[in-house]
């Protein structure tokens, strides 16, 4: 009888990527940090929810800092040194995520705000009255 070998998950290959792009999407409810190489292939990612925060605490600056540290640690293991930072969204975790990337040991060469702005597109939802 022929025996088949069991696959126990996918083994990620360690590649040496010195330069990369960090995409920080910061909303009011969550912060998502994706680190890619220059061609756009994702090397590591993390979010406030994936870092263990739930509910309203996902939108805090501390949750964004924790998510950025986790993603940066994984990128440093792949050999990344220099990064460009693209920030999108109005959330409170923007600055703290950038600061956490710097403290983790990544050299930031560029910070760009790529928040999409409508040129008077769709009608906005009505204002909340609390």
Curated annotation (Swiss-Prot):
SUPFAM superfamilies: Translational machinery components. Gene3D superfamilies: Ribosomal protein S11. InterPro entries: Ribosomal_uS11 (IPR001971), Ribosomal_uS11_bac-type (IPR019981), Ribosomal_uS11_CS (IPR018102), Ribosomal_uS11_sf (IPR036967). GO terms for molecular function: rRNA binding; structural constituent of ribosome. One of its GO terms (biological process) is translation. Keywords: Ribonucleoprotein, Ribosomal protein, RNA-binding, rRNA-binding. GO terms for cellular component: ribonucleoprotein complex; ribosome. PROSITE patterns: RIBOSOMAL_S11 (PS00054). The keyword Ribonucleoprotein applies. It comes from the Bacteria. Disulfide bonds: none annotated. Part of the 30S ribosomal subunit. Interacts with proteins S7 and S18. Binds to IF-3. HAMAP family: Ribosomal_uS11. Belongs to the universal ribosomal protein uS11 family. Located on the platform of the 30S subunit, it bridges several disparate RNA helices of the 16S rRNA. Forms part of the Shine-Dalgarno cleft in the 70S ribosome. This is Small ribosomal subunit protein uS11.
């Amino acid at each position: 009888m022929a025996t088949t070998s069991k696959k126990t998950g996918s083994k990620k290959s360690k590649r040496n990527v010195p330069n990369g792009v960090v995409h920080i999407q910061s909303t009011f409810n969550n912060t998502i940090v994706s680190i890619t190489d220059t061609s756009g292939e994702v090397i590591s990612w993390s979010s406030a929810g994936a870092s263990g925060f739930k509910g309203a605490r996902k939108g805090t600056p501390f949750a964004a800092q924790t998510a950025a540290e986790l993603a940066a640690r994984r990128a440093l293991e792949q050999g990344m040194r220099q990064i460009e930072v693209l920030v999108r969204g109005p959330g409170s975790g923007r600055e703290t995520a950038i600061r956490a990337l710097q403290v983790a040991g990544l050299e930031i060469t560029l910070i760009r705000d790529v928040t999409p702005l409508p040129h008077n597109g769709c009608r906005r939802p009505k204002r909340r009255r609390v």
